[in-house]
From Swiss-Prot:
GO biological process: rRNA 5'-end processing
Name of this protein: Putative pre-16S rRNA nuclease
Disulphide connectivity of cysteines: none
Subcellular locations according to the entry: Cytoplasm
Protein's job: Could be a nuclease involved in processing of the 5'-end of pre-16S rRNA.
Enzyme class: hydrolase
InterPro entries: RNaseH-like_sf, YqgF, YqgF/RNaseH-like_dom, YqgF/RNaseH-like_dom_sf
UniProt keyword Isomerase, yes or no: no
Annotated Gene3D superfamilies: YqgF/RNase H-like domain (3.30.420.140)
Record keywords, A-Z: Cytoplasm, Hydrolase, Nuclease, Ribosome biogenesis
Any one annotated GO CC term: cytosol
Length: 145
């Protein structure tokens, strides 16, 4: 199956950022932020996104430590990726998401956003777009014709 459209997920225990990316353009953009309860999203919202966007695969960010070793959250993010695969029969990929939230906060400031708390105006969707863009950039050679 040819990959054309991807959804990217920035997994978190309270919020999960979502982005969409197209292989043909090599571009990713933010979609939305889903609320989560202890890492569990509202699966009806996830299903609505899957039905609307009809992705060929999903990319889930892995929150690796700065030295490249898996963090405690990596296991939970991988479990989330496997659940997406099991529920929607979509292939999944994981991608290093180190510093994407930090970069997303900087991006929010550049756009004129707040400097304080990100609870009311989360950056998770921006982080999802950054990690998905990173995956697209890292795998561009796979899609060249």
């Amino acid at each position: 199956m040819a990959l054309r459209l991807l959804l990217g997920f920035d997994y978190g225990t309270k919020q999960i950022g979502v982005a969409v990316g197209q292989v043909i353009t090599g571009q990713a953009r933010e979609l939305c932020t889903l609320k989560a309860q202890n890492g569990v999203p509202d699966w009806n919202q996830v299903e609505a996104l899957i039905k609307e966007w009809k992705p060929d695969a999903v990319v889930v960010g892995l929150p690796l430590n700065m030295d490249g070793t898996p963090s405690d959250m990596c296991l939970r993010a991988e479990k989330f990726a496997r659940r997406l695969n099991g529920r929607y029969n979509l292939p999944f990929y994981t991608h290093d998401e180190r510093l994407t939230t930090f970069e997303a906060k900087g991006e929010r400031l550049v756009r004129g956003g707040q400097k304080g708390s990100y609870r009311d105006n989360p950056v998770d969707a921006i982080a999802a777009a950054l990690l998905l863009q990173g995956w697209l950039d890292a795998n561009a050679a796979l899609f060249e014709t």
